[in-house]
Amino acid sequence: MTRSTTPPMRAKHSSAKRSPSRSAAKVNPVSVKPNKPLLSKALHPRNAHLQGYDFATLIIAMPALAAFVRPNPYGNPSIDFADPKAVKSLNAALLLSEYHINGWDIPEGYLCPPVPGRVDYLHYIADLLAVKGKVVKGASIRGLDIGTGANGIYPLLGIQTYGWQFVASDIDPVSIDNVAKIAQQNEKITAHLQLRLQPQPEHIFKNIIAADERFDVTLCNPPFHSSLAEASEGSLRKVKNLAKNQQQKHGQQSRKLAVSQAKPTLNFGGQKAELWCQGGEQQFLANMIKQSRDYANQVLWFTSLVSKSDNLKPCYQLLKQLNAVEVKTIEMTQGNKATRILAWSFLTPAIHQQWATLRP
């Protein structure tokens, strides 16, 4: 089998300079108005949130959000992102107003994901699956979300944005039940989504992918931390960063208030499987890559978010050992946060072309 590995690249949507050893691309930076900072410095060009949040529209869609909206230092409406109730209300309003998702909610203590960053992943996946440069929409695309969580954010956004079909898996029955409740309130989502409980946490694809199934792509946002203590430290660090930003904008007193009022276990919370696992992100990725080899002919692209760039090198080494045919790293930036998508395939370019022609 011929192996053609693409080293790390930065995704973009204009011309890309290529060299024999590296494919690089950049998302064009968004211009920033001096008196109105954007939500992100480099969201995907198709991201609906490039210009930040339209709170007037969001409040019309969900009036309850108004209770959490206050002017930010620039005089524009915003919320306290250290307040878990405010963040959840914002998410529900965004999903209803922009993506027409009714009844989104999560149980207390479960992970509340930022919508702009999550939908960015899907936009880059759409580019990865594009045929002759054209994004494929509709039910011919089948995605598998590994560890969908109680929020079910990837299948919900993928269905509403691109019309894809999804299977969403999780080891937590509460998460599966909660996503089912959301789906029941949305006819299109019900028709495009299957939920599957993983009975064996050590397995990622086994028990989920049936022998006769094919998926165009798998998605995953793996647990980052290796222990509960490490996860708690990470949550506290996020709170301190928020407080530091508050201090820069409002002074020392505001920082003290932010730290004293913040509750990291809530806003930056999540259940065990959402936040940590033995060996952390690196071990989870290694397990996923090893197990993906058994489903090499049933999945066109395996993908995962990788939060820590240091975890990429061992992934590349393992994929080389397992004879992956193609490997891509798509870098993303949301505000000051950099992350990346690792994508790999065991199928040759010829099979990739054939796969596209066999889609219904």
From Swiss-Prot:
Keywords: Cytoplasm, Methyltransferase, rRNA processing, S-adenosyl-L-methionine, Transferase. Residues 10-20 have a biased composition (Basic residues). Transmembrane segments: none annotated. It catalyses: adenosine(1618) in 23S rRNA + S-adenosyl-L-methionine = N(6)-methyladenosine(1618) in 23S rRNA + S-adenosyl-L-homocysteine + H(+). SUPFAM superfamilies: S-adenosyl-L-methionine-dependent methyltransferases (SSF53335). Its main location: cytoplasm. One of its GO terms (biological process) is rRNA base methylation. Its EC number is 2.1.1.181. Specifically methylates the adenine in position 1618 of 23S rRNA. NCBIfam families: PRK11727.1. It comes from the Bacteria. This is Ribosomal RNA large subunit methyltransferase F. GO terms for molecular function: 23S rRNA (adenine(1618)-N(6))-methyltransferase activity. It is an enzyme of class 2 (transferase). Belongs to the methyltransferase superfamily. METTL16/RlmF family. Residues 1-38 are annotated as: Disordered. InterPro entries: METTL16/RlmF, rRNA_lsu_MeTfrase_F, SAM-dependent_MTases_sf. One of its GO terms (cellular component) is cytoplasm.
